[in-house]
Amino acid sequence: MIENYWTSFCGNHHTSSNCTVRFLQICFGITLSFLTLCICLFHKEPPKRIHQFFCLRLVSALFNGIIGSLDLVLGIWVLRENHSKPLILWLVILIQGFTWLFINLIICVRGTRIRKSSLRLLSIFSFFYGLVSSCLSVNNAVFGDELAVRTILDVLLLPGSVLLLLSAYKGYRFDESGESSLYEPLNAGDSNGFSEKADFDNRVSQFAKAGLFSTLSFWWLNSLIKRGNVKDLEEEDIPELRKEERAETCYSLFEENLIEQKRRLGSSCQPSILKVTVLCVWRELLTSGFFAFMKIVAVSAGPLLLNAFILVAEGNASFRYEGLVLAVLLFFSKMIESLSQRQWYFRCRIVGLRVRSLLTAAINKKQLRLNNSSRLIHSGSEIMNYATVDAYRIGEFPYWFHQLWTTSFQLLIALGILFHSVGVATFSALAVIILTVLCNAPIAKLQNKFQSELMTSQDERLKACNESLVNMKVLKLYAWESHFKKVIEKLRNIELKSLKAVQMRKAYNAVLFWSSPVFVSAATFATCYFLDIPLRASNVFTFVATLRLVQDPVRMIPDVIGVTIQAKVAFSRIATFLEAPELQGGERRRKQRSEGNQNAIIIKSASFSWEEKGSTKPNLRNVSLEVKFGEKVAVCGEVGSGKSTLLAAILGETPCVSGTIDFYGTIAYVSQTAWIQTGTIRDNILFGGVMDEHRYRETIQKSSLDKDLELLPDGDQTEIGERGVNLSGGQKQRIQLARALYQDADIYLLDDPFSAVDAHTASSLFQEYVMDALAGKAVLLVTHQVDFLPAFDSVLLMSDGEITEADTYQELLARSRDFQDLVNAHRETAGSERVVAVENPTKPVKEINRVISSQSKVLKPSRLIKQEEREKGDTGLRPYIQYMNQNKGYIFFFIASLAQVTFAVGQILQNSWMAANVDNPQVSTLKLILVYLLIGLCSVLCLMVRSVCVVIMCMKSSASLFSQLLNSLFRAPMSFYDSTPLGRILSRVSSDLSIVDLDVPFGLIFVVASSVNTGCSLGVLAIVTWQVLFVSVPMVYLAFRLQKYYFQTAKELMRINGTTRSYVANHLAESVAGAITIRAFDEEERFFKKSLTLIDTNASPFFHSFAANEWLIQRLETVSAIVLASTAFCMILLPTGTFSSGFIGMALSYGLSLNMGLVYSVQNQCYLANWIISVERLNQYTHLTPEAPEVIEETRPPVNWPVTGRVEISDLQIRYRRESPLVLKGISCTFEGGHKIGIVGRTGSGKTTLISALFRLVEPVGGKIVVDGVDISKIGVHDLRSRFGIIPQDPTLFNGTVRFNLDPLCQHSDAEIWEVLGKCQLKEVVQEKENGLDSLVVEDGSNWSMGQRQLFCLGRAVLRRSRVLVLDEATASIDNATDLILQKTIRREFADCTVITVAHRIPTVMDCTMVLSISDGRIVEYDEPMKLMKDENSLFGKLVKEYWSHYNSADSR
């Protein structure tokens, strides 16, 4: 039945070449119609034109309209008479008639609405279409039996096409003012190609205004690629994206569709994020789908032409010049295939770019809206992973999307061609293909499972990496690097197990699908043998050619499955995140401030809870509060009483479960933990506001920043590091205060802002900032510093989530027992050494300001944050060698490459055996098939060896590279973290490492495979027809030159892409960390817009990179088409019988796949060149200059060192970088063993630097520190830090349990931990938790108050019981009552230890043995506190006088 159908479709089998020609005519007609449609739809914004030569267009319209109409009538007539004519004949005539009418309508009637360049290009294509159709019709009329009427109509197409050409060029007069000429990119610019006009036309990509020819040929990229060959590209050299690809456009469309879907579904249903995303890109998906369809149709013409060519070689030509015609058709079919495939891939990449941009933008916006419960589920590191890994994986999926259906479609067409070649034996081929797919089905399910496991384990490892990198200073201080590194290594090993499973399945799939053509061929030929179907060169090599063209898409099935699974898992994770609950206004209402209204905040019977409604007892209960404008309200209470939660409730962070809360006007917020952005000090203060010089200067003065800025290299333009790592805690807090003050808000919420600054600065800030600058504002200030309380209009006393007392200071002091205990506790901590107040309290301030130099810790060159390293020029072989040298991976790569070469040689031997013996009567068919199968099986064995070796190399290299990277990062000095943004490091351990794990290993072998296959194809062509070398050698040379020309630009584009990707990650990391502050200042929109800008900055080099890739491939495909056509011409010109038809068929079958092989070769090389940059980027961080060794065996201190804790500091000099000034300038002093040492000085005077030197976080450039006779510079840093104890200024908790945070090394029993918790006033709090010591501590310890976090840090020190303990203002964030208990605990637990206290509170050091005063990096004085207080010129004495002057004045109010 199928045989009869084929006969009715094509007619006589002996005229199959005519059938092929007709089939190609149908393809060309459809292509031209689609091209016309595209011009009509997408190129219809014309410049102004004046009509001219109307008669010419009228004549053309009438003449061509008549021809087209007659073609349609003839086609319908032939259709009715199909019992006597082949089906394909009426189809050709109908399509030709429709195409001609459509083109005529556009050129002659609608031409005034089409771009000039597009109109002229269409007329040129129409002319060639008419010319070819006329020639073919005349040829068929002479040598065949074509219809006479159709011949006449086809001949008339030629004059008709000339009329269309004239109509396009002469039928209109165009106004050139607004038109971009088709050839404008060729002529624009000066001799260097870089005139101002050609300089990307207002920074927008040339793609935005490219004509049809320029779009199809990627001509618009010429200027950028040329520029990349003249100079190394920089970010500013890359044009901006056109509007359609910008993140703002993509996200706006996403939001519109989301709103529309919500409106349709109603409030009860959540719209599908996937559906909304597809709605944003469906047009481009359809367009790319059409190009995919055209590519499949064009590629399917190859085997048909090959079959016709072999028939001609056997002497069965239908007419004299049939071979030449077939060669020309072969060339044009390959060119159409190239154009279609390039546009298919290019437009899919655009879809991927848009999806990636809109998802990244959506993640950025969503994270600014997450409520507390959502943040507990989606940690900061996970959010980073969604944007930096998952969004990129989804962005890659559209590239593979059409492979899901084109593979099946191409397979169906191939089966049709195979049936024409070998008849019913095709069913054997189909059975093997189905069996192959069925074998892959369970593997696909396993792959899905393993991929999910891999992504989950990757998340866990990234979370641990992020936590360790963020808190690296704490890890070094506690000497916990090795333990946390082992935790990460353990998670990495779990990840590697999943990676191995994924890669082994990928290897299995590769073997399965690469070997399937061998088994398909063997099964088919065996069926032919048993069914006595003759095997001839024409049907065998038509079969082989068809199979060679099908096998590449079939081989891609594993990749398609893998990418689809990855995208599915990634999309589900992002969708879950985007659907997470957001902050709700609830009962919180913001109202405009009116002139008559004096109320700033009104809270009525409100309760607030961090958890879900009704799930637990509310964190704040029965809160009623009114704050008026101009009123200053202090909030105090013990640790964990709910002070910070109250501020969070007013900000809307803590959900209101009952009651109401109203506020009037704008809010400014200062968090307890300072949040600083990477950038200049001015940027941090302005925070997006407009510069007002007067207000700005006043803000600097009121925030006590003026003296600090005077000493900075560039003043307020000095760049500060990520999270303000190069600033002291006090400086960061004052920048926060300046940011809030500059906003000139109506309501100020200040969360313990003075805990991080010294006593003098705190006093100055309170007077100048709170009482003066904020006069007239509503101020709610959380504080533990009781001495400030008398100045407030009212004081709120909180306990256990309730406001227990609210009144003036004097009233509370008179009647509240709890408040009296609070004040008395403060007086007790202050000690009894009361100093008489000075007569003029302001005088000491001036004197102290004169004495204390504000030398800052940041006195360095203004650019602390280093610009990200970016290699320039050719990467060379270095990164490849670095990758393959890991664990001797080169051995496995060599074996894999050898196996791949053997496989390719085996395929050639297979086909050579078949070509040489298919027509040889002396070789039986059975022998022919058996030898063919045996060679194939040997080749498959080589494939298995190749795949296994690649997986082994992958695992060894991935494990080794990450191990080196992790060791390097954990051994890097703190100066590296101070000058390197976290996002830059995280991009290495996330996206770059993911590429190295998943893409690089198979990328290497695919480059070898595709290069070997291309070489084999060229070799076969050259052996069969050596004359083609005259064409192929220059063409291959041209291909290499084009590739080199391309690589110069492409590598820089990918490097810039990697660098700009870090910008997106950095901004997201900062936004996640500062989300509360951003929301408090209503700056969400500004941060979101900045994220859009950064996404575009990253997307632009990526867009131009993949466009450049298509630019190169299209030119290489043209080269391969020329080589193929030249080979065909050579074969035609050779005398008949020079080569057997078998070898001719073999050569052409390889030639047909040459362009595909060349494309895959270059494409794989390009991908690998881009991927190998990730190895290069990892390598930048695997060879960081390490800090001192952890352990030096020759100089290890005794086990019980230090015994007494005597610290001798001799002429200590510290600078942070070689070119920076000294921060400590010759410090010399001795801390006797068992003494309690207090270190005081103004913020930035060098106190923290001295502590850093003691722990060797920074190495001295001169002098030394000796502890109990041991020079600490001579021993390992682990031995040093593990013997000291510290309670850092910024309390840090890690994700895990209470037990883990107190004892991560598991060195103590539960009983010891409970005992310590009791001493630190945490026992009751932990016991109230359901899980006790196993109670959850989330990332950053955000589910515990700041004071509780600091108590945990104290607990660590008590557990360690070191002979030398350092307290860096350890009690700054706790209330005075708790402070009193803790001071007693420290005195009791560390009675015989050396305790070094960096103090901001003067009372903290009053009971110290000695006090060290530092100013400007030098020792001002060092003596007993009582002696210093008696000295009139003593700096410490003046600080104490200032403190008590302020305290006494407050106490008397």
From Swiss-Prot:
Residue span, ABC transmembrane type-1 domain: 285-566, 886-1170
Superkingdom as given in the UniProt entry: Eukaryota
Binding site for ATP 1: 637-644
Keyword Lipid biosynthesis on entry: no
Tissue-by-tissue expression: Ubiquitous.
Disulfide topology: none
SMART domains in UniProt: AAA
Keywords, alphabetical: ATP-binding, Membrane, Nucleotide-binding, Repeat, Translocase, Transmembrane, Transmembrane helix, Transport
Transmembrane segments: 23-43, 58-78, 87-107, 124-144, 147-167, 290-310, 312-332, 415-435, 511-531, 889-909, 925-945, 993-1013, 1020-1040, 1128-1148
Membrane topology note: Multi-pass membrane protein
Cellular component annotations (GO), alphabetically ordered: cytosol; membrane; plant-type vacuole
Main location: membrane
EC number per UniProt: 7.6.2.2
Cited InterPro entries: AAA+_ATPase (IPR003593), ABC1_TM_dom (IPR011527), ABC1_TM_sf (IPR036640), ABC_transporter-like_ATP-bd (IPR003439), ABC_transporter-like_CS (IPR017871), ABC_transporter_C-like (IPR050173), ABCC10-like_N (IPR056228), ABCC_6TM_D1 (IPR044746)
The protein, known as: ABC transporter C family member 10
Organismal lineage: Eukaryota, Viridiplantae, Streptophyta, Embryophyta, Tracheophyta
Gene name tied to this protein: ABCC10
